[in-house]
């Protein structure tokens, strides 16, 4: 009898409405929208969803596989804790301490993954103080998706919402946290972050199989690691992160995407911009929320001065902005100390997160007075042995008149030499080199590691550039 009762109790537990991890206590729902919820019950079962902020109850039917989907209308953002009650005939699940605010989906590789606690021998600047005081940010919540490479798309991934405090925050993505902190401070609303990232991944890892199968440089039989279990090195494979980490979250109602990736695509710059666009187009389509904003980070300087492979990747990232509507890139060219030259994980993530936040605040939330775009090359004019450069996003000038570093000039022989650069007028730069009498091309910070020192008046750095289209 005891065995039978136990079995019946267990059966009832299994039958109760089932939710994915992303719907948990402490979650943040996007404000003033129809927020999407889903889960599982018995096939054909009626499922009800009730909220503490409304007297309305939404009733939906589970499909033949037990999957159900519902939407609830959310109010304006508030720090007041809310509850959701989701029930079927066998029981109910109550989600507590739910906040209504702004939700952003963050993805990429290790520099997005990198937590406030840092990686081995790779610290985050100021982390101890940030972690110690993190409980004061009661409106910041983060769900960190566990790494999960899968050969085929799955319905579930692990990773529940956590409140911000010294116990939880060391595992929060540093870049995403600093983004959330800035947005929370300016808008004074709760901010939820879904961190779905995995160090070392290529852009192809976040795309589905049918898309990647069309790429001539990828052989799925060769490139997908099929051995079980799906271990840490599966980041090397295409499609696996899309299948196991991103696909289960598609449809969670968000405000936009943040992306920090590219180091693993160095050497593949000719295909990167288009593939990034393909990824963004696909994500937007599958989320079904229209042209969601997509703000992304230029990879930071790393490696040897002599190399240029990562410089070409940065150039591809900058070009991607013109391909992807409602997108913008933030530069990080000024954020790496000399001793970090061969460290792909620089310590300054506060500036990265803040620059992403400037983009969102200025362009998504329409906050006036915030500079968001880094100055960038527009055109050149050769006058004898001198080149006059013009720029966009530099209407108010630059941070220095002389002592500009990182410029090079080449003639028809394509040999580059360090050049002297000075401000002309308010927002043009004059470049000259005594070794090049007939200049053909100018480059700025166009090496694997070659930080420049030019920025606009708000401290946003000049994006690395070249005026030529040579292969190297």
Predicted segment positions?
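Cell-envelope and extracellular/periplasmic
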Residues: 14-472
């Amino acid at each position: 009898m005891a065995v039978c009762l136990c079995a019946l109790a267990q059966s009832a537990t299994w039958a109760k409405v089932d939710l994915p991890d992303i719907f948990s206590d402490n979650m943040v729902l996007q404000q003033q929208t129809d927020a999407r919820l889903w889960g599982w019950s018995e096939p054909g079962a009626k499922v009800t969803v009730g909220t503490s902020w409304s007297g309305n109850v939404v009733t939906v039917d589970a499909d033949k596989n037990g999957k159900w989907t519902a939407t609830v209308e959310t109010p304006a953002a508030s720090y007041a804790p809310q509850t959701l009650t989701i029930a079927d005939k066998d029981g109910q699940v109550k989600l507590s301490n739910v906040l209504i605010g702004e939700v952003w989906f963050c993805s990429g590789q290790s520099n997005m993954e990198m937590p406030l606690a840092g990686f081995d021998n790779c610290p985050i600047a100021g982390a101890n103080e940030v972690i110690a005081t993190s409980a004061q940010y009661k409106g910041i919540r983060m769900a960190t998706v566990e790494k999960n490479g899968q050969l085929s798309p799955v319905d579930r991934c692990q990773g529940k919402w956590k409140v911000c405090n010294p116990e939880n925050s060391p595992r929060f993505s540093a870049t995403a946290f600093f983004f959330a902190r800035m947005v929370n401070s300016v808008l004074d609303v709760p901010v939820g972050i879904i961190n779905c990232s995995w160090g070392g991944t290529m852009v192809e890892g976040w795309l589905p199989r049918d898309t990647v199968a069309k790429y001539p440089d990828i052989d799925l039989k060769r490139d997908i690691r099929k051995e079980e279990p799906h271990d840490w090195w599966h980041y090397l494979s295409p499609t696996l992160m899309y299948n196991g980490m991103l696909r289960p979250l598609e449809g969670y109602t968000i405000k936009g995407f943040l992306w920090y990736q590219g180091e693993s695509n160095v050497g593949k710059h000719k295909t990167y911009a288009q593939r990034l666009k393909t990824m963004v187009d696909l994500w937007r389509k599958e989320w079904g929320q229209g042209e969601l904003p997509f703000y992304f980070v230029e990879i930071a300087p790393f490696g040897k001065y002599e190399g240029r492979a990562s410089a070409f990747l940065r150039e591809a990232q900058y070009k991607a902005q013109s391909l992807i509507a409602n997108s913008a890139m933030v530069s990080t060219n000024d954020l790496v100390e000399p001793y970090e030259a061969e460290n792909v994980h620089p310590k300054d993530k506060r500036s990265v997160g803040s620059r992403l936040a400037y983009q969102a605040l200025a362009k998504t939330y329409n906050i006036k007075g915030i500079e968001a775009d880094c100055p960038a090359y527009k055109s050149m004019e050769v006058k004898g042995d001198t080149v006059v450069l013009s720029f966009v996003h530099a209407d108010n000038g630059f941070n220095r008149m002389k002592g500009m570093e990182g410029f090079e000039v080449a003639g028809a022989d394509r040999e580059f030499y360090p050049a002297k650069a000075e401000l002309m007028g308010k927002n043009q730069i004059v470049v000259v080199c005594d070794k090049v009498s007939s200049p053909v091309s100018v480059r700025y910070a166009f090496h694997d590691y070659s930080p420049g020192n030019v920025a606009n008046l708000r401290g946003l750095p000049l994006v690395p550039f070249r005026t030529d289209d040579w292969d190297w």
